[in-house]
Amino acid sequence: NTLEVIMKGFYHYRFLLLDFVHVMRENPNIRAHYLEMEQRRKVQFDQLFQLLIKNEIMREEALPNEYKLLYKRFEIIGNFWMSSAQIENDSLSPNHIDEYSLVMHQAIYPYLTQKGKEEYVRLFSV
C-alpha cells in the first residue's frame, strides 16, 4: 500500500530522520525546503479530507480545526516514528515499518463513517 511505500522511503533515509531536529537547525536551505514542502502537504491533506467527507468516507469535523490537528498528528508521527522505534528497541530494522504503518493507518479510523469503516476493513483485511 502507499503508506508502506512511504514508510520504506523514510527508512531508507533514516540517517536524516534520526537526527531530524539537528538537521533542520543546522541547514537553513534544507529547513526552508522542508517547510515549503510541508505547506504543500497540508493543502493536499486538506483536499483529501474534504474529498473523503464529500464521499461520506470521513465524518464532518466535530471540533474546530479537528482535521488540521489530525494532519499535525500525522506530521509528528511521520517525522519522529524512527526515533521512537530506535529508543524502544535499541536498534532500527525494516520490521518496524509494519508496526508504525499500522499506527498511521489506525489514526484515521475514529474519523471514518460507517461506510468508511467498512471500506477500511475491506482494504486492510482487518
What do the predicted segments below correspond to?
Residues 83-126:
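C-terminal peripheral helix-coil segments that are non-catalytic and often amphipathic
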Residues 18-20, 33, 60-61, 120:
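Short, hydrophobic secondary-structure boundary micro-motifs
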Residues 30-57, 68-83, 102-110:
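Amphipathic alpha-helical packing segments from all-alpha helical-bundle domains
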Residues 30, 63-67, 90-97:
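Residue-level recognition of alpha-helical structural elements
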Residues 1-16:
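Hydrophobic alpha-helical connector segments
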